[in-house]
């Protein structure tokens, strides 16, 4: 395709970082864009170009980390629009990295559309300044939850902000979940409870590692005895495995646990989640997958985005993941299991509403694209002359 005359959409997020949540977002976004605008040339800006090319061989991939302004400008100036998002990329010390590239695009006259962004924690004045300076000039600003809208407003952004929902809510499952579990020697003749952990870090700076490891070990042992269950830890990124093993090492019933070690695509992980009987976890997109699969779930909110999601789907959620909440947490697990038919029915209704809002993000972007970069005209074929 001659990109000088084509419509070109760039997509910038935490892609190529081998986080299944971010990859689920990208996959769902690309699926909708390809379905509606097959004429569009897509360029994904990736942290690991080789990984992204293997996952999405039908799009162009550009590495951007550690690339100077002059070189990245060669790719940006060819775009019709740059999509920032989705995913939680606007937080302290990280936001400025993405927004420098956004400002470069804007300086080149490339419009920017923010797509169901997640924001927070965002208190560093340098990052807040970047937010105000760049997003004020965006064509449109959409965020995935009310928490993110509040964070951007507190950072000083005064323009209209539209709340939609996480793009990963539109992910479709793949196949082979049973085979993937069998390959990891997960038994299939018992109840399966999925658990999700994560590492402390800038996005979870108040997380007490030792405390939450022991808390989840207590929960795991309770599940084994209360439900006669096998506990499966589902890593959403590579470092989750280390924390999962730390939890298992503190359990009395470690032999009733499996930590998955495979490499999975988002669609495969969603299909694995569909095989669970119960889901308890910290990672937002693990919880989104459970909601999509109709699995009763208990969020463990380490950050506002998880608590916000729990509220939106009507799931119970304790404030914080600390050892002192062990008794309350075990009681909530017990209640969730006993009330699971009603809980799932309620959650399914709420999830359908969120999927409509996620569809709304795509609709808004595609409408913007149609206004600024119209679809190519398709000329009707001339009628075939009648045989004489």
Language-model segments: what does each one mean?
Residues 1-388:
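Active-site anion-handling motifs in enzyme catalytic cores
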């Amino acid at each position: 395709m001659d990109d000088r005359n084509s419509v070109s959409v760039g997509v910038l997020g935490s892609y190529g970082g081998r986080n299944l949540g971010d990859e689920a977002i990208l996959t769902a976004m690309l699926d909708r864009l390809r379905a509606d605008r097959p004429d569009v040339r897509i360029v994904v800006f990736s942290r690991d170009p080789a990984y992204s090319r293997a996952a999405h061989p039908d799009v162009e991939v550009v590495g951007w980390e550690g690339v100077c302004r002059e070189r990245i400008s060669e790719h940006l100036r060819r775009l019709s629009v740059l999509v920032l998002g989705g995913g939680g990329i606007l937080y302290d010390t990280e936001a400025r990295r993405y927004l420098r590239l956004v400002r470069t695009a804007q300086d080149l006259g490339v419009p920017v559309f923010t797509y169901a962004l997640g924001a927070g924690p965002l208190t560093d004045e340098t990052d807040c300044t970047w937010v105000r300076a760049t997003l004020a000039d965006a064509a449109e600003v959409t965020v995935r939850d009310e928490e993110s809208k509040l964070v951007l407003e507190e950072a000083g952004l005064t323009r209209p902000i539209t709340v939609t929902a996480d793009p990963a809510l539109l992910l479709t499952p793949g196949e082979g979940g049973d085979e993937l579990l069998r390959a990891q020697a997960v038994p299939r003749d018992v109840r399966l409870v999925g658990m999700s952990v994560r590492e402390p870090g800038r996005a979870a700076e108040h997380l007490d590692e030792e405390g939450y490891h022991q808390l989840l070990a207590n929960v795991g042992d309770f599940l084994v005895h209360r439900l006669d269950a096998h506990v499966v830890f589902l890593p959403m990124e590579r470092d989750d495995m280390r924390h999962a093993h730390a939890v298992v090492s503190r359990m009395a019933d470690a032999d009733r646990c499996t930590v998955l070690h495979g490499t999975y695509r988002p669609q495969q992980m969603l299909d694995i989640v569909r095989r669970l009987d119960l889901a308890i976890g910290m990672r937002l997109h693990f919880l989104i997958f459970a909601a999509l699969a109709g699995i009763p779930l208990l969020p463990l909110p380490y950050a506002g985005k998880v608590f916000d999601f729990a509220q939106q789907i009507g799931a119970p959620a304790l404030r914080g993941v600390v050892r002192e909440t062990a008794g309350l947490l075990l009681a909530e697990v017990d209640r969730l299991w006993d009330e699971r038919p009603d809980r799932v029915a309620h959650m399914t209704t709420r999830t359908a509403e969120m999927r409509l809002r996620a569809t709304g993000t795509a609709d808004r972007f595609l409408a913007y694209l149609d206004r600024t970069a119209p679809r190519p005209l398709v000329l009707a074929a001339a009628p075939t002359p009648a045989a004489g």
